[in-house]
């Protein structure tokens, strides 16, 4: 797939796409890049969880010449079953093979939604199994202290009793689910990826 001035080969996809022409990646999709530099993780698509900003962010990262894989979680909507504030409906989770696919990479970029408590609970569960440095992209103004209070290891604030293997190294807020991602936010994600991959 030619993107920008460099060609990237992406092994895509494990299941058939959704929508007209199969343009929307379905849950369980893993599109693997030739080199395992960055993996972008999306919530499962559905009525409230749209993968649109993830597609635009991924395209921007690839255009910057960074080898990027994409994983759409099989159970990416809802909140974890052990979250303090339970909810009816779907339950967020990660399969062992999904964690293994993510851990083959150097850096994870994960897109969450707009409820701070949901972001914190999801990040907590994901990073129990994902061991690589992670950048969170979301709409809500969450910060490292919010994550550390729940036992999530972060670059800036370390919890007294860490519950996670992985560490949040950066956060990009203001990315609205289901809306086009502004170029300034895509640039911010790319800048932070380059910083943590030592590409500057």
Curated annotation (Swiss-Prot):
A biological-process GO annotation: methanogenesis
One Pfam family hit: MCR_C
The keyword Plastid is annotated on this UniProt entry: no
Keywords: Methanogenesis
Keyword ATP-binding (UniProt): no
Cross-referenced InterPro entries: Me_CoM_Rdtase_prot-C, Me_CoM_Rdtase_prot-C-like
Quaternary state and interactors: MCR is composed of three subunits: alpha, beta, and gamma. The function of proteins C and D is not known.
Name of this chain's protein: Methyl-coenzyme M reductase I operon protein C
Gene name of the encoded protein: mcrC
């Amino acid at each position: 797939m030619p993107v920008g001035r460099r060609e990237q080969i992406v092994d895509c996809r494990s299941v058939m796409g959704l929508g007209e022409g199969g343009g929307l990646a379905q849950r369980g999709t893993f599109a693997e890049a030739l080199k395992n530099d960055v993996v972008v993780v999306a919530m499962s698509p559905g009525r409230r969880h749209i993968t649109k900003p993830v597609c635009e962010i991924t395209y921007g990262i690839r255009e910057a010449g960074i080898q990027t894989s994409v994983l759409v979680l099989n159970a990416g909507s809802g909140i974890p079953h052990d979250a303090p504030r339970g909810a009816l409906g779907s339950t967020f989770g990660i399969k062992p093979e999904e964690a293994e696919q993510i851990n083959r990479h150097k850096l994870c970029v994960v897109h969450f939604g707009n409820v701070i408590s949901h972001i914190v609970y999801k990040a907590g569960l994901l990073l129990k199994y994902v061991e690589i440095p992670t950048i969170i992209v979301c709409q809500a103004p969450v910060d490292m202290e919010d994550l550390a209070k729940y036992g999530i290891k972060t670059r800036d604030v370390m919890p007294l009793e860490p519950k996670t293997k992985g560490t949040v190294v950066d956060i990009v807020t203001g990315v609205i689910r289901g809306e086009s991602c502004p170029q300034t936010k895509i640039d911010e994600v790319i800048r932070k990826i380059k910083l943590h991959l030592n590409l500057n």
